[in-house]
Amino acid sequence: MSFSVDVLANIAIELQRGIGHQDRFQRLITTLRQVLECDASALLRYDSRQFIPLAIDGLAKDVLGRRFALEGHPRLEAIARAGDVVRFPADSELPDPYDGLIPGQESLKVHACVGLPLFAGQNLIGALTLDGMQPDQFDVFSDEELRLIAALAAGALSNALLIEQLESQNMMPGDATPFEAVKQTQMIGLSPGMTQLKKEIEIVAASDLNVLISGETGTGKELVAKAIHEASPRAVNPLVYLNCAALPESVAESELFGHVKGAFTGAISNRSGKFEMADNGTLFLDEIGELSLALQAKLLRVLQYGDIQRVGDDRSLRVDVRVLAATNRDLREEVMAGRFRADLFHRLSVFPLSVPPLRERGDDVILLAGYFCEQCRLRLGLSRVVLSAGARNLLQHYRFPGNVRELEHAIHRAVVLARATRNGDEVILEAQHFAFPEVTLPPPEAAAVPVVKQNLREATEAFQRETIRQALAQNHHNWAACARMLETDVANLHRLAKRLGMKD
């Protein structure tokens, strides 16, 4: 089989359509799956010895949240090292990273796999992976044809990364130096709320403004602070963390501003405070609402004049520190109640950010679950950790009062429970492995129990034949319209019909 000019042109056109990189990448992956008649396809970006999914088709949604470290995925490592088309034999001993992650085929393992590394010059920037359930599924395509596909995808990905880099540099102050070597914090989520938050982080990071990050407990406020710091001109300097809620009043001032020898009992030497440690960098004050009014006044002075005094010292020290503060309280209400200084609130909230709770983030819960599943897999040395359909349904309907932190702990606990009840190193998380209270799931549709007169394979094929016949009849035997009605692509429908003996 050879690609026609029309096929290649169609792929190129899809890469120019859409309003953003994510949309273009999704169109590319969907088109490739149709052209190559594969069961699953994915576009991955390479970063710091791991592959990060950018777009998928035919794979479980939680794949978008997973981070595939090379040391934990030998097939992906082979693709990264190859420099050319990689075809894995059906009997390859290397585990496929997508085993159990094709919806409806969780118990089956992928048979055919092709990997296409993507390069910008000599630099690896990503990969395309193509998977199928039939061992010889990609034999009809030559390496040269697959290289053409890889070249188109590499060009699109390279341009997207270049535009991203230029946009980031354009937001920097004129005298700022790009810092490409800094690893960027991964903020997982594609929901509207998270997309907007990422845009706001990108905007404010390039400035030197103080930022007030608000959100419920467990939403990831510290991660937001890290993302701001790492995307700022201060990224080459330290990010210093201080939890204000954990500070006893007796040592709080010393922790913030330092002390000199003999300033108080136990001060046996000079000690720098968090502000000195963060000089030329960023200081993250978590739970800022817990500071006493006396300390709030001293913090306000630092923000106003940029100098500090160590406890027991009359001299002032100049510091250049950007302050990021976080709270799970409504500081406006705290100001009205007299528990928080209004002038400090206005100093801190020059650019306020709000982190949405997990219950408002839609399918992000599945992406995050995939991320935590992959973390558990690596930590426990398992070959795979996947979510069953029932587990995904449960996660999507639970409200998570503890937000992302609660989800993380729930996944870790479920993996441990599932591992204890299953032999081997493969774990499938079922709904019963989660101990969520008061979860109301949509009621299942009632169905009569049929009398079994044939084996499971025969019953499945009979059902598929009848479903296809009915769909064809309703669509005047138009296979494309039939495929749309059945919510599958036409190439897969033709292959299924042939296997069922409905087509020559």
Swiss-Prot record:
Gene Ontology molecular function: any one: DNA binding
Q: Which residues carry this modification: 4-aspartylphosphate?
A: 57
Q: Which InterPro entries match?
A: AAA+_ATPase, GAF, GAF-like_dom_sf, Homeodomain-like_sf, NorR, P-loop_NTPase, Sigma_54_int, Sigma_54_int_dom_ATP-bd_1
Kindly indicate which segments of the sequence are annotated as binding DNA.
Answer: 479-498
- Describe which pathway this protein belongs to, using the record's wording: Nitrogen metabolism; nitric oxide reduction
Which CDD domains does this one have?
Answer: AAA
What keywords are annotated for this sequence in UniProt?
ATP-binding, DNA-binding, Nucleotide-binding, Phosphoprotein, Transcription, Transcription regulation
Which BP terms does GO give this entry? phosphorelay signal transduction system
Q: Where is the Sigma-54 factor interaction domain?
A: 187-416
Pfam families attached here?
GAF (PF01590), Sigma54_activat (PF00158)
Whether Disulfide bond counts among this entry's keywords is: no
Write down the Gene3D superfamilies for this protein, in alphabetical order: 1.10.8.60, 3.30.450.40, Homeodomain-like, P-loop containing nucleotide triphosphate hydrolases
Binding of ATP, residues: 215-222, 278-287
The job of this chain, per UniProt, is described as:
Required for the expression of anaerobic nitric oxide (NO) reductase, acts as a transcriptional activator for at least the norVW operon. Activation also requires sigma-54.
What's the name of the protein? Anaerobic nitric oxide reductase transcription regulator NorR
Q: Which organism is it from?
A: Shigella sonnei (strain Ss046)
Gene name per UniProt: norR
